[in-house]
Design a protein with these regions (language model features):
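Oxidoreductase cofactor-interface core, primarily capturing Rossmann-like NAD(P)-dependent enzymes
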Residues: 38-41, 52-137
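Conserved short hydrophobic patches within well-ordered secondary structure
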Residues: 23-27, 46, 88-93
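Solvent-exposed loop/turn segments at secondary-structure junctions
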Residues: 11, 50-52
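Active-site beta-alpha turn of Rossmann-fold NAD(P)-dependent dehydrogenases/reductases
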Residues: 7, 44-47, 81-83
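NAD(P)-cofactor binding segment of oxidoreductase domains
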Residues: 2-6, 11-43, 61-72
Length: 137
């Protein structure tokens, strides 16, 4: 079995910051090492628009660390950054609610349908590596 393109997606876990960073760094290092051995020609990773501006969040620090590993590797790559998915809105609202109080984020939110992101990732994966970041919003 051989692969010319690898897609990665990491789910946000409700875990401590250290665990998230460690998971994304370890899994990304392992994946990149195996891709190098296999001669993979295109690593595609899904990330979030604004990651570099939200480093006070452990999740976004972890995503930034993941992106840095990818950009620092020898594997040609495309990082696809998207806004949060419409499908996550209920979970975000539930997480932000305590009793009858809702904490509103200071960040702007511009959700996108997961299907639209999947289509964009597919198009990018089938193309040549951009060795950079593509934003889908």
């Amino acid at each position: 079995m051989s692969f010319s393109t690898i897609l990665t997606r990491s789910a946000k876990e409700r875990a401590c910051i250290f665990s998230i960073v460690k998971f994304l760094e370890t899994s990304t290092r392992n994946l990149l090492a195996q891709e190098a051995k296999a001669g993979v020609g295109h690593h595609v990773a899904l990330s979030v628009i604004g990651t570099e501006r939200m480093l006070s969040s452990g999740y976004f620090r972890a995503k930034m660390a993941q992106e840095n590993l990818i950009t620092g590797s020898s594997i040609p790559y495309s990082i696809v950054r998207a806004t949060q998915f419409f499908e996550f809105v209920k979970g975000i609202a539930d997480f932000s609610t305590e009793g009858n109080k809702v904490r509103l984020p200071s960040a702007l939110i511009q959700p996108i349908a997961a299907d639209d992101v999947a289509s964009a990732v597919g198009r990018i994966a089938m193309g040549s590596p951009v060795n950079g970041t593509v934003e889908v919003d």
